[in-house]
A protein has these predicted regions:
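Short, surface-exposed linear segments at secondary-structure transitions and domain or protein termini
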Residues: 253-255
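Flexible, glycine/threonine- and acidic-rich loop/arm segments that mediate assembly and lattice contacts
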Residues: 1-242, 247-250, 260-267, 273-274
Length: 274
């Protein structure tokens, strides 16, 4: 596919305030941005998992205790993910870049082109797109590990990464007791239940609020703030769950996240010289 370049007659200059009609919200990136990790390897470790006993009462007689029990071991499983490439390009002709004073559309005396620099505008707009692509990948990314230079590394997102402690709602509205049941599942899996956050879309958020009203319960607004993101909260029998209107979620899907355990990893880019 050939490049599409910004030229004088393809990208016209206008005066007036700029408004982006696209969706640029990236709340998950904002919340976890302060915990970024770096790596020098395209594949990185997210952790190891192992399981010890669930708790039982041993039955060992004095006679049996004189002989060592049969040996056994605890095995471990390593979990990994991969980094992937996000890349955009812009092209502006020298003639276009030097022709920002020629205005199209309605012109009022003493107005000037907005933006005043085409290259700066194009780069900033592409960065907004990349940020949104990263947010989408954090949520809905489908894992693929490259096996050659011609194949693609694709980061595993949260939806795909969560394979246990799931609940199928069968198209039913999500209510407070459903949230409580998910917290119970997490507790039953021996995972921390402090600071859990329900990352949901607008429909699910409305369902939770409606259920709270019908049952005489309260959703506490702005109960907590992380990196400028205000989270509401509800109380379950096991603990407080925060609520947030997330982005890039598949329809009918909500995520119950421990935001303190979520971070992103990026490769350290080498410096280049020309």
């Amino acid at each position: 596919m050939s490049d599409t370049l910004a030229t004088s007659f393809r990208v016209l200059n206008y005066s007036g305030m700029l408004f982006n009609k696209g969706n640029t919200r990236c709340p998950l990136s904002s919340i976890i941005g302060g915990r970024a990790k770096t790596t020098n390897h395209v594949e990185f470790v997210t952790g190891q998992e192992y399981t010890t006993g669930g708790g039982e009462q041993p039955a060992i007689s004095e006679t049996a205790s004189l002989t060592a029990p049969e040996a056994s071991v605890i095995t471990r499983t390593q979990k990994t993910n991969v980094t992937q490439i996000f890349m955009e390009a812009v092209g502006i002709s020298y003639a276009k870049q030097s022709n920002m004073g020629t205005l199209s559309g309605l012109n009022v005396a003493n107005q000037q082109a907005n933006p005043i620099n085409e290259l700066d505008f194009q780069v900033a707009a592409k960065m907004q797109k990349v940020n949104r692509d990263i947010e989408f990948t954090f949520i809905q990314g489908t894992f693929n590990k490259a096996t050659s230079d011609a194949t693609i590394n694709k980061t595993r997102g949260l939806v795909e990464a969560i394979t246990t402690n799931t609940k199928a709602m069968s198209s039913k509205p999500l209510g407070l007791w459903d949230i409580a049941d998910m917290v119970k599942k997490i507790y039953g899996a021996n995972a921390p239940t402090d600071g859990l956050c329900l990352w949901c879309d607008a429909t699910t958020l409305f369902q939770v609020n409606a259920d709270a009203v019908q049952n005489g319960l309260t959703v506490v607004p702005a109960a907590r703030e992380i990196n400028g993101i205000a989270l509401s909260s509800v109380v379950t029998p096991i603990g407080v769950v925060y609520l947030y209107l997330g982005e890039c979620l598949p329809a009918g899907t909500a995520l119950l996240l421990n935001l303190n355990a979520v971070s992103y990893t990026h490769l350290t880019l080498p410096t280049t010289s020309r």
